[in-house]
């Protein structure tokens, strides 16, 4: 007598034989078999296949429900169908007949069966990523299930980030967090902080790729709020690019005042605000000028020197000011100062260890190295700045030369290295012309300047550095005549910047009754200077005033050098030179005709061509070639 299993198998085979040719007969066999053997999986599954092949969604759903309820843990065929069903639900936009069947059949399943299918799939899947996708699918279909199941999903995401951080971070921020943001689950502080750090890392990569940074910061602040809710933190402020950063800082200070030492809440709020301010600083350091991206570099500003010795050079304990030299200076200074505030808070004993670990986990190394160098300059920590500069490998030689020059100015005197940096800067001037800057010098207070890397600004800074070193020599006894002329040449960039210095130079010229002819005929093109020199010349009717000339600083004869080559020449208001007045007028007319020349180019050439003489002025270095001697 055949066994029950043999009878079941016989009936299934008969139904399978007739399934294509006579579905009704096949169904009759299955109905009879189900009546005789209601607990037989093969019969129940064959009944489902008949309904599936006939595209009977509702009847297929009934059969599938019975199988899924009664035979959860037993048969491979069932799990294959469940996988096909969940794959179709995850890709509902696909229009294949197979996908369409599963999607429509799913709608006829009871909610309880639907939910159980998801949970059984999650519990029996060995693939972590597959389980995560089923969780996401279940939360989309059953939003309330996230209340109890989200912690488990978030733990799985955190685990997956150890091996594939990019993939699991994207799933977290783009798929999971939006589903739980309205009612975040409670999590352990460690897990919530790990998830926030991973989200922050994901969005920072977007920001560094220069995608839509406003959206990225909006999402970062949103994730911060979600993770804060998970840990029961006092809410921070939502992101708005129109909110002044002072508002965020004041909110942070308010939270800090009511929090215990080393609070994770303050740590993460302050870290977020620090990175936000740091990004604003780094982003604004690059500005579009004349169709070119121009970087701004933080450098030491010039302090006006007074011969009266009013104590203005006594170092102040106050932090330096920021000069408003460009339109972007206010934004840059605010972002920098807010980043500095947060940095100082986060490097106190209560936060330093955890903050350092956070910084190691985030892709911020280029920003941090730039910021720390600028911070060292800001606080006047020259030794630290030098050490940090040695660790910065990505900057250009132009920027490095500018920063070394700035460090020279910070210490109050220019070294030979600083002067060599000026020559290197002038040899690497960019093509972007730019404009001259205002407020490069302040009286009585150390200040910082955000210098754009344009031709005009760089030459202006180099000229200012030389003048700041030489200007006080004008008030010393026995100042060389040549020095007076060279400073006048440099002052053409901004003649009104130091009226007292200009007056002192002209007073000395009047007293000594001489000026260098080559300096006048080669480098002086400013109308005001030419008029003043003409006035001095024309006013010397009785006393002789001489213009003297000799070989230039490189030893090469100029147009005004006599045929003898190295012989000095002089013309005066009276004496042997009969055509002196006509020659002087010709020289001044020639220079006036040049008044529209590019003074930036003129002064860059002057410094390059006369660098040996300038070095002698600054350092007292003996010239290896003949110098111009003024009577």
UniProtKB/Swiss-Prot annotation:
Region span, Disordered: 545-577
Disulfide-linked positions: none
Keywords in alphabetical order: Nucleus
Subcellular compartments: Nucleus
Major location (coarse): nucleus
GO biological process: RNA polymerase II transcription initiation surveillance; snRNA processing
KW Plastid (keyword) present: no
Polar residues compositional bias, start-end: 545-570
Domain of life: Eukaryota
One Pfam family here: INT10
Family: Belongs to the Integrator subunit 10 family.
Role: Component of the integrator complex, a multiprotein complex that terminates RNA polymerase II (Pol II) transcription in the promoter-proximal region of genes. The integrator complex provides a quality checkpoint during transcription elongation by driving premature transcription termination of transcripts that are unfavorably configured for transcriptional elongation: the complex terminates transcription by (1) catalyzing dephosphorylation of the C-terminal domain (CTD) of Pol II subunit Polr2A/Rbp1 and Spt5, and (2) degrading the exiting nascent RNA transcript via endonuclease activity.
Protein name (record): Integrator complex subunit 10
Organism: Drosophila melanogaster (Fruit fly)
Gene name for this UniProt entry: IntS10
């Amino acid at each position: 007598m055949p066994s029950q299993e043999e009878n079941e198998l016989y009936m299934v085979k008969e139904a399978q034989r007739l399934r294509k040719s006579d579905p009704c007969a096949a169904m009759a066999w299955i109905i009879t078999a189900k009546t005789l053997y209601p607990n037989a999986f093969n019969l129940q599954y064959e009944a489902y296949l008949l309904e599936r092949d006939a595209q009977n969604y509702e009847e297929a759903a009934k059969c599938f429900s019975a199988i899924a309820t009664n035979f959860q843990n037993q048969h491979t065929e069932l799990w294959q169908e469940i996988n096909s069903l969940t794959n179709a639900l995850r890709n509902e936009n696909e229009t294949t007949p197979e996908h369409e069947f599963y999607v429509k059949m799913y709608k006829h399943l009871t909610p309880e069966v639907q939910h159980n299918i998801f949970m059984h799939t999650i519990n029996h899947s060995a693939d972590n990523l597959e389980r995560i996708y089923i969780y996401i699918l279940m939360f989309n279909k059953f939003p309330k299930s996230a209340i109890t199941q989200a912690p488990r999903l978030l733990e799985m995401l955190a685990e997956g980030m150890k091996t594939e951080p990019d993939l699991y971070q994207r799933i977290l921020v783009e798929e999971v967090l939006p589903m739980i943001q309205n009612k975040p689950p409670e999590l352990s502080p460690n897990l919530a902080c790990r998830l926030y750090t991973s989200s922050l890392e994901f969005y920072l990569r977007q920001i560094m790729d220069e995608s839509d940074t406003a959206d990225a910061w909006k999402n970062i602040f949103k994730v911060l709020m979600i993770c804060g809710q998970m840990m029961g933190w006092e809410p921070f402020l939502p992101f708005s690019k129109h909110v002044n950063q002072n508002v965020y800082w004041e909110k942070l200070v308010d939270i800090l005042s009511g929090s215990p030492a080393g609070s994770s809440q303050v740590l993460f709020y302050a870290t977020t605000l620090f990175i936000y301010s740091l990004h604003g600083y780094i982003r604004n350091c690059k500005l579009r000028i004349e169709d070119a991206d121009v970087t701004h570099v933080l450098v030491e500003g010039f302090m006006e020197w007074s011969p009266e010795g009013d104590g203005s050079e006594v170092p102040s304990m106050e932090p330096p000011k920021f000069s408003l030299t460009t339109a972007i200076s206010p934004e840059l200074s605010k972002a920098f100062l807010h980043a500095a505030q947060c940095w100082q808070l986060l490097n106190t004993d209560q936060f330093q260890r955890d903050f350092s670990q956070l910084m190691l986990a985030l892709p911020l190394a280029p920003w941090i190295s730039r910021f720390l160098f600028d911070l060292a300059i800001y606080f006047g920590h020259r030794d630290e700045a030098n050490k940090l500069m040695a660790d910065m490998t990505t900057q250009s030689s132009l920027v490095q030369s500018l920063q070394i020059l700035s460090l020279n100015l910070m210490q109050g005197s220019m070294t030979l290295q600083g002067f060599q940096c000026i020559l290197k800067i002038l040899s690497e001037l960019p093509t972007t012309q730019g404009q001259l800057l205002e407020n490069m010098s302040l009286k009585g207070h150390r200040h910082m300047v955000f210098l754009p890397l344009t031709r005009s600004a760089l030459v202006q800074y180099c000229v200012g550095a030389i003048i700041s070193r030489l200007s006080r020599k004008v008030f010393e006894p026995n100042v060389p005549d040549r020095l007076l002329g060279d400073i006048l040449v440099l002052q053409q960039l901004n003649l009104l910047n130091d009226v007292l210095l200009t007056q002192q130079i002209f007073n000395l010229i009047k007293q000594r009754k001489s000026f260098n002819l080559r300096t006048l005929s080669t480098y002086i093109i400013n109308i005001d200077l030419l008029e003043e020199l003409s006035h001095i010349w024309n006013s010397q009717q009785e006393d002789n005033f001489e213009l003297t000339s000799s070989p230039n600083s490189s030893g090469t004869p100029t147009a005004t050098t006599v045929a003898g080559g190295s012989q000095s020449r002089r013309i005066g208001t009276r004496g042997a030179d009969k055509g002196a007045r006509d020659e002087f007028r010709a020289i001044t007319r020639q220079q006036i005709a040049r008044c529209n020349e590019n003074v930036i180019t003129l002064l860059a050439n002057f410094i390059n061509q006369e660098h040996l003489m300038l070095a002698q002025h600054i350092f007292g270095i003996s010239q290896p070639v003949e110098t111009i001697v003024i009577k």
